[in-house]
Design a protein with these regions (language model features):
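A short, acidic, amphipathic alpha-helical segment used as a generic capping/interface helix at domain edges
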Residues: 52-55, 299-300, 304-316, 349-357, ...
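Well-ordered mid-protein domain cores that form the structural environment of catalytic cofactors
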Residues: 82-163, 183-189
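N-terminal glycine-/serine-/threonine-rich phosphate-binding loop
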Residues: 32-62, 340-341, 347-348, 471
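Extended hydrophobic packing segments that form well-structured cores
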Residues: 1-31, 36, 44, 48-49, ...
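N-terminal active-site beta-alpha-beta segment that forms phosphate/nucleotide-binding
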Residues: 54-116, 347-360, 365-367, 371-377, ...
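Conserved, well-structured core segments that form the ligand-binding/active-site neighborhood
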Residues: 132-321, 328, 348-361
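C-terminal catalytic subdomain
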Residues: 340, 344-447
């Protein structure tokens, strides 16, 4: 059969055996039905007025309260007119105004964590013209700055040693509200440093997305606050080899140490703030449409949202495990332009596929992936990546985990920090999160082929094999690794559509068990 796979800004055609199994999210197996557009406002309002495990906003918020509404950045969630963020913010504002909260006491805060701080065009795209114009010109929209210590609160360490530093405005508000997508010291001694605006607010609201995520199963809930409004030292408690290379991390589930740390850090933030986050998370489909909406306390709301999201995300598909997994990388996806050409980002994307689909892969599985791999690092977005790539080839760095000892050195390099704060770049420590993930592909495959690379030496420097075409790569894999009749899984559009976590057909029902 002939199939097209993403390659650069176009596609590369592959001739694969007719026995190849093809999976396209939302098409091969249909998503659960989404909420009709005309019912979204009412469904969102009903969720917000009937929160799980805590009182509604009309009882939590009062005249004179300060409120921070925490919003995911542009990486996930959709920007269509009916996107969850747009609708949830408007409904929440109506509830706050009805409770006596004044507009001047409300801040919209983007929870970008170590991602590039949300740009003005991105703010406009995410919020829409009406919301943007209501709040931007009065300086009531901001993006979390994890290096502005005037806006951070050091909460110390969890009992398990994790450092928690959070956004000061969220900490100080009367009611913190998290709008998400179900996408001091804690019990593990993790250091917690958080955003001060959130810490100081009377009401902190998290708007999120319950969306399949290789890091801990789902976005949203406590993952949102633990990664989005904290500091690199806090994120270094979980986005590291010691956590990501454990057996409980692959395949993806909500039962991993990483997920436990998200939850523990989130609860610790609530303990120090003196009140819980008010969450409003939407379960999203392949096209970022709302399947269901849940509000309330993250601890009680998360499991209920996951139960619904499991039906869309953990897909029983394979009758037997696969020898070969085939897909393609565009240049621009997920973390931005250059994701499919920057070698460190390429390796992270390859590994994310392993984390999601390990349940259907044989132990000696081979990956074949198209990438233009032309040397485009997008240095403005990932200014540290070229230096990391060069260092990886020197000074006894045999595998990517050997680079971990340089994390603090890069995380404190002033020029990289300035580019994160003021020039739209990722934080330098994000590169170490990416490398922690990137090694997982090597850990779980016999070989990985990049086909169509314009600069194949870059791919080979990351331990990847290179061939000109899918057909050449498959022939080599059949000769050396998988035999003459491999079971092949093809994943067209895998980086263009909302991802799933593939499972065996005879697996136990429910996420983490299929």
């Amino acid at each position: 059969m002939k199939l097209d796979f993403e390659y650069g800004n176009g596609v590369m055609t592959a001739q694969l055996p007719d026995s190849t199994k093809v999976f396209v999210p939302g098409q091969t197996v249909s998503d659960p039905p989404h909420i009709p557009e005309e019912q979204l406002v009412e469904a969102t309002r009903n969720s917000i007025r009937n929160p799980i495990g805590m009182p509604p906003l009309c009882q939590l918020a009062h005249a004179g309260n300060t409120v921070v509404i925490v919003i995911p950045d542009i990486v996930k969630g959709g920007c269509q007119p009916t996107a969850h963020r747009k609708i949830a913010i408007r409904v929440i504002l109506d509830e706050l105004y009805a409770a006596g909260v004044e507009k001047k006491d409300i801040l919209l805060l983007f929870s970008n964590g170590l991602h590039p701080r949300t740009s003005v065009p991105e703010m406009r795209k995410i919020l829409g013209e009406e919301l943007f114009n209501e709040f931007y010109h009065t300086h009531q929209i901001d993006s979390h700055d994890s290096e502005n210590y005037d806006d951070l609160v050091d909460l110390g360490y969890t009992t398990h040693g994790d450092h928690v530093i959070m956004n000061k405005r969220v900490f100080a508000c009367d009611l913190p509200i998290l709008i998400g997508h179900t996408q001091g010291y804690t019990d593990h001694g993790d250091h917690v440093i958080m955003n001060k605006y959130v810490y100081d607010a009377d009401v902190a609201i998290l708007i999120g997305h319950t969306q399949g995520n290789p890091y801990g199963g789902y976005s949203g809930g406590y993952k949102h606050c633990a990664t989005g409004i904290t500091h690199w030292r806090c994120i270094a408690a979980h986005h590291v080899p010691e956590v990501m290379h454990r057996k409980d991390f692959v395949p993806v589930s909500t039962h991993s140490m990483m997920r436990n740390k998200f939850d523990e850090i989130g609860r610790y933030m609530e303990e120090k703030m003196g009140h819980p986050f008010f969450c409003c998370d939407a379960v999203l489909d392949t096209y970022s449409r709302q399947i269901a909406i849940y509000s309330g306390c993250a601890e009680k709301m998360q499991p209920i949202a996951w139960e619904v999201a499991d039906k869309r995300t953990y897909v029983p598909f394979a009758e037997e495990k696969f020898d070969v997994m085939v897909f393609g990388m565009p240049i621009d996806f997920h973390y931005g332009n250059g994701m499919g050409t920057n070698p460190i980002q390429m390796m992270q994307a390859l590994s994310a596929q392993v984390i999601r689909h390990k349940r259907v892969m044989k132990e000696n599985c081979v990956i074949i992936c198209s990438s233009i791999c032309d040397g485009y690092f997008h240095d403005e977005r990932w200014p540290y990546a070229r230096e990391l790539f060069d260092l990886f080839g020197h000074d006894y760095h045999q595998t990517l985990p050997d680079m971990a000892s340089l994390g603090e050195y890069f995380a404190t390099k002033e020029e990289y920090i300035r580019k994160y704060r003021f020039a739209g770049a990722f934080h330098p420590y994000h590169g170490f999160s990416m490398m922690s993930c990137a090694h997982i592909a090597e850990m779980n495959t016999s070989a990985i082929y990049i086909v169509g690379a314009r600069e194949p030496g870059i791919a080979r420097a990351m331990g990847l094999k290179t061939r000109a075409t899918f057909e050449e790569a498959l022939a080599d894999a059949m000769k050396k690794y998988v035999g003459p009749s491999p079971n092949i899984l093809a994943l067209p559009q895998t980086f263009k559509l909302g991802a799933v976590h593939l499972c065996m057909k005879d697996g136990a029902a429910g996420q983490g068990h299929c």
